[in-house]
Amino acid sequence: MAGFYVLIKCFEQEDDYSNLRAEPSKMDELIAIISCEIHLIIFFIVLVSCAPNETLSKPILGETELPAFRYLALGDSYTIGESVSAEERWPNQLAKLLESENIKSEITIIARTGWTTSELWQGIQAEEIQPPYDLVSLLIGVNNQYRGYDINEYRDQFNFLLHKSIEYADGDANRVLVLSIPDWSMTPFASSRNREQIAKELDKFNLVNRESSEKVGVPYVDVTPISREAVNDTTLIAQDGLHPSGKMYALWAEKALPIVKEILISSK
């Protein structure tokens, strides 16, 4: 308020300025007016300097929080993360990697240890899923191989699940991700079994799911080579001697990350 009072008083005395210059007896009053004008200049300088900085108040590009993308993960023990914590599951580690790049996710997992293709479908039907999802991952088949089920039956049931996955992704095959079956022949659990035979059978099952995925344009992540590194690195195996450790799941997530990022970018 004091600043505005000074401003008003200066304008009130402006008309007398020329007269004051001609009358030396009023020199003190002239000095007072000059002082008043100086205060007026200072007042405007302070007023401008106190104005908000519009450039700094604007949001920084890239810091705007986007809604979380919805992710549905379908599978068996390799998706639910048997013998590891929830945070160590590969879908959760994938979500963590995305979060580090400011991409948040909302994960729904439908998976259980021991499930075959037909049991996964039963499990899906028992859940109240809410499509469409921004991303759907599918990893299934190891228990079909383990139980000795016919590979042609696996082909039919996998194709059915693959098309359901595309349906859950709003009909967009590019928003579905298929992972290969890891090779459990390299684990301590298989030490008393025919490891070579197991590996060959898994290769055949993986050929089926890869060809099915490529036929409909679904991205494919081959994690089988990573699982075979366990023969020289026991830290890639969980304490149960059969399933992957959190360390191996981290490698899966890292391999899937660039593909998933491309999926999310292309689906915008």
Residue ranges of predicted features:
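Intrinsic-disorder-associated, low-complexity terminal segments enriched in Asp/Asn/His/Tyr and depleted
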Residues: 16-19
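Serine-esterase "nucleophile elbow" of acetyl-processing enzymes
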Residues: 51-113, 123-132
